[in-house]
């Protein structure tokens, strides 16, 4: 979807009555009432196998893996056609030497894996990551244990008017800043990184305060779905490449 279509009234965000039925089993209680069920068995098995394979790739010992969870849009009611399957290995970082460096290492492994693989389940990309077992998740965000085959936290339905003028203005505020840097070919890396960090912290503040359906998180998701998060990241990488390249001809 183009940004001008968003301004006219369209949105990339969705809120459903049920979880994604391509992935989840459901036994309706009544018409339009379908509680969160279990993940389809064959999908669960595939994701567990992939998670352990990724752990070997990342050189994470199996004994530090405490659980494997599914979270993100496809474990909630706000999934879209572009939502990932977010598979996280919960690891005991206390059992890792140089645990202060492990976060950067895991992020690097995730990014390298994503650059070289395109794994999909029912048409949805699978993103694998690892996080500390004690790391909190937003209270209203669905979290499903693949190993235990049950919900750790069941997803909740909340309504946010994503077509309101105030919501659109906030998205436009960030879009205008991103476009300003790119259109004016701003080369100030510190300023670019500050904008990236501003957007990241804006989202984190919302997740901590009100969770998955926070105003701030939905603004971020709209920016991401419209392509502006990647647009800013790609521009920053181009500026870095140009800064450190040299041609004497």
Model-predicted regions and their roles:
Residues 2, 86-88:
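Generic low-polarity alpha-helical segments
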